[in-house]
């Protein structure tokens, strides 16, 4: 049996563009895509921390080092420039693969620069 698990996420990315009439998808700085171990055309879930919207789309590459996070096509209606979003990818893993699986977590600053990376989320306590 396969388990559907978090593979990677870009945490608190800042939306830099929203292009309604561009081909649909989410353009992400190619350096951030590579650092997170994501891939061009991979399906992503986007969680808009600023307004609560949650939706699916896929990755297209934006200029490396640009800090670009651009929601395009229908996704542009789900965000405003400046919104903070979490961009997540998931994968299917066997029980054997899960023994060593750790997600790649990339935490971003206000300018979509890398603050830090991790492979664990601290346990939430009351």
From Swiss-Prot:
Modified residues annotated as Pyruvic acid (Ser) in this record: 25
EC number from the UniProt entry: 4.1.1.11
Catalytic activities: L-aspartate + H(+) = beta-alanine + CO2
Keyword field contains Lyase: yes
Keyword Lyase appears in the UniProt entry: yes
Protein role: Catalyzes the pyruvoyl-dependent decarboxylation of aspartate to produce beta-alanine.
Oligomeric form and interacting partners: Heterooctamer of four alpha and four beta subunits.
Protein name (Swiss-Prot/TrEMBL): Aspartate 1-decarboxylase
Cofactor: pyruvate
Main location: cytoplasm
